[in-house]
Amino acid sequence: QNDHEYGGIGVAVADRPGGPYKDALGKPLIDRIVNGAQPIDQFVFRDDGTHYMYYGGWHHCNMVKLSDDLLSVVPFDDGETYKSVTPENYVEGPFMFKRGGKYYFMWSEGGWGGPDYSVAYAIADSPFGPFERIGKILQQDPEIATGAGHHSVIRIPGKDEYYIVYHRRPLGATAMGHRQTCIDRMEFDADGFIKPVKMTFEGVKPVRIK
């Protein structure tokens, strides 16, 4: 691991979601390894008006605070700029969402090119953690697919209805790059824990959002 290895996080801007996008900085926002984290797989999370960014590969995850215009990294109140928030078994692909006053931190485990790629999670009272690993909620199914991981989560506005979007490898596929983007329902039990996701071939039905 050194600063010559592949990685870098940039910022692009556009007038509408469909683009076209242009580089906002002319250089990477983060282009070096800090706390062992390869600068990839960024996720921006807004909490109480503040934007935080979680990122990192190589089994390390950092958290940074973004400026109001999202174009720079600024120090936290304690003066620290990069906070290591790496949970047990973390590999890459961090994701955060808030539900019922709790912070759900999710990540991918295993190697993306193998069958054991999967998604695990933790629940915390703060966006800073600590993030104690609870367990896997998405992993290979010998009847459906292997290598299920690197996800995002969608919530239907105004409803407690969640979906997980991820990639997986079809059964029998051997090429590392042979992956499919899929979506399935993600549900919670009465105590707020995420139920194991059941992969399907059908996915989910369209949902109209006003």
Predicted segments, located by residue:
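Carbohydrate-active catalytic/glycan-binding domains of CAZyme proteins
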Residues: 1-210
